[in-house]
Amino acid sequence: MTFTQQVKKELSILPINVKTSKSELSAIFRLNGIYHLGTAVGNTLEVQTQNPASARRTYQLLSQTYEADIQTNIERGGSAKIFGLHRYGVITMKQADQILADIQLDPFSSDRRVPEVFLNSQAKQQAFLRAAFLSTGSVNAPNSKNYHLEISAADEDLIEQIFSIMNNRNFNLGAKIADRRNKLIVYLKTGERISDFLSIIQATSSMLHFEDARIMSDMRNSANRLANADNANVTRMAEAAERQYEAMDFLRQQNRLDNLPEKLKIVADLRLKNPEASLSDLAGMIEGQELTKSGINHRMRKLMQIVKELNHKKV
């Protein structure tokens, strides 16, 4: 089961709230509804989806809100079987026109915006977003490389409405709109915002799972960054120690060690005897003196400058 399927399954079993059920149905029929005119049983209203959880929620909303005469069907194989998924249909047999009038949806109008009466409270807005996600939403798994949640729609006014609600003062999700393959999407790209959205639509278990996975992923990423930084530091230290050893070896070959001031000669001798030691290690090897890494580094810079000047004269 994908994470999208997990979220939709959780949403499909939430208790139906009759005060907000029409807000859900308003979104579902505007996004996935099909109006059939003049069938053998009269006008019918159908919702088609490839997600069984979405079909289940639609069935429950219709049966509990309208006690409607509902028929369900599943199309298997052929063109209906896309990416291994079947197409589920939920059809109202006798009350299509009543339901459309009730949710103020004119099937012959190009206006797909949801009326304000279905969005005039935070609870109704949450129900609307929940139904929109159930209808056309998807979300990447929390352990995927990139966080991404989206809701799609063919109608520009409807996508603008979804966008506006996601970004209003109640939710402030920072959603954005994009045009993708002849459809519009509203999307979120940060883990924190996706977690907030899942909480808003009451997918609480999925939100907690998402947060757990996100925290673990962030911890692994932090550990990897620290490990990479440590490895880089070790590499830099090893390269610096090698350069210092070569410089001190040059002084030895040029018979310059005995001419150095005693403090510098001690450090040069220690580096020659301990080519891979860190500056802190070298500081701890000097007997009778309390010398810090900074002190060793200061003396080493003087030695490197001497080598540089000798090389310059040699050229």
From Swiss-Prot:
It comes from the Bacteria. The keyword Cell cycle applies. GO terms for molecular function: DNA binding. Signal peptide: none annotated. Belongs to the WhiA family. HAMAP family: HTH_type_WhiA. Coiled coil: none annotated. Keywords: Cell cycle, Cell division, DNA-binding. InterPro entries: Homing_endonucl (IPR027434), Sporu_reg_WhiA_N_dom (IPR018478), Sporulation_regulator_WhiA (IPR003802), Sporulation_regulator_WhiA_C (IPR023054), WhiA_LAGLIDADG_dom (IPR039518). One of its GO terms (biological process) is regulation of sporulation. Involved in cell division and chromosome segregation. This is Probable cell division protein WhiA. NCBIfam families: DNA_bind_WhiA. Residues 278-312 bind DNA.
